[in-house]
Regions:
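N-terminal glycine-rich anion-binding loop in soluble enzyme alpha/beta folds
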Residues: 1-55, 124-167
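C-terminal and late-domain segments of enzyme folds
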Residues: 2-6, 189-201, 207, 218-233
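Gly/Ser/Thr-rich loops at beta-strand to alpha-helix junctions
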Residues: 18, 74-85, 98-104, 123-127, ...
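Glycine-rich, highly charged phosphate/nucleotide-binding loops
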Residues: 50-66, 171-179
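N-terminal active-site wall of soluble small-molecule enzyme domains
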Residues: 58-63, 81-88, 92
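Non-catalytic positions within long, well-ordered alpha-helices that form the structural scaffold/packing
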Residues: 68-71, 109, 184-185
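Short, acidic/small-residue loops that bind anionic groups at enzyme active sites
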Residues: 90-112, 207-225
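Charge-patterned, long linear interaction tracts outside catalytic cores
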Residues: 165-204
Length: 233
């Protein structure tokens, strides 16, 4: 197959959102020393993506096929709740699909000692249902090794969904550090996994404070590029 241009190994399905994209956010192109192809899907919003509304699936598949046609070798997304559509989109294209950091759970569980837990920090844990986990090949047995905490009631992070029109990353950072400190205080945590793509700008501070590895969608993109963007050098 011939392409109109080349060099975009990673493609990102982008949910429409007003939230700023600081360094660390998956949709901040300045994070990467390699090109990333961003493709906005106009019919998406926090309601239908977080809720896994199958009515938008045709639009998502069309967008994924566009990324494939443009030469992308791997597709991810700008919101962790795209995981609702992981299975269907993976079946619809002939390139690799990792729509959410949730797809990392089967990779992370084996690294834990038997007495350790994987702490998952998400926006709204009610939206992380078993259908979503199954779509990402995450079993109930794996989830027994996990602790899930959300931030939906935190003042700064709740501004994202409530469309308040303002978002203070410094305050959000403090919220996340405080939450993760409490989680670690009461549990033997071997690693943190951040579902929400608005959280990675805070990953460094969480890891520095707790001295525990923190995995997120932005790190996942960099990892995927080492594979799909491998160079002969």
């Amino acid at each position: 197959m011939s392409y109109p241009f080349s060099g975009y190994d990673i493609g990102v399905l982008v949910m429409t959102s007003w939230v700023p994209k600081p360094m660390g956010h998956i949709s901040q192109a300045g994070n990467y020393n390699f090109p990333v192809y961003y493709y906005p899907v106009d019919s998406t919003n926090t309601t239908n993506i977080h809720g896994g509304d199958k009515a938008i699936l045709p639009d998502l598949i069309t967008a994924a096929k566009h990324l494939e046609e443009m030469g992308c070798k791997c597709i991810t997304s700008s919101c962790g709740y795209f995981a609702h559509f992981q299975k269907e989109i993976a079946e619809a294209v002939d390139i690799s699909v990792y729509l959410s950091s949730i797809t990392l759970i089967p990779f992370l569980i084996p690294m834990l000692r038997k007495d350790e837990k994987l702490a998952i920090l998400c926006y709204n844990k009610e939206k992380l249902n078993m259908e979503l986990f199954h779509s990402c090949n995450v079993s109930k047995k794996m989830l027994e090794r996990c602790i899930i905490q959300d931030v939906i009631h935190e003042k700064e992070f709740s501004n994202i969904i409530k469309d308040q029109g303002h978002y203070n990353i410094t305050n959000a950072r403090k919220e996340l550090v405080d939450i993760t400190k409490d989680m670690k205080k009461n549990n033997n945590i071997g690693a943190f996994l951040l579902e929400c793509t608005d959280m990675p700008p805070c990953s460094y501070y969480i890891q520095k404070e707790l001295n525990v590895p923190v995995f997120d969608a932005t790190i996942m993109v960099k990892f995927l590029n080492t594979i799909y963007g491998r160079k002969n050098k």
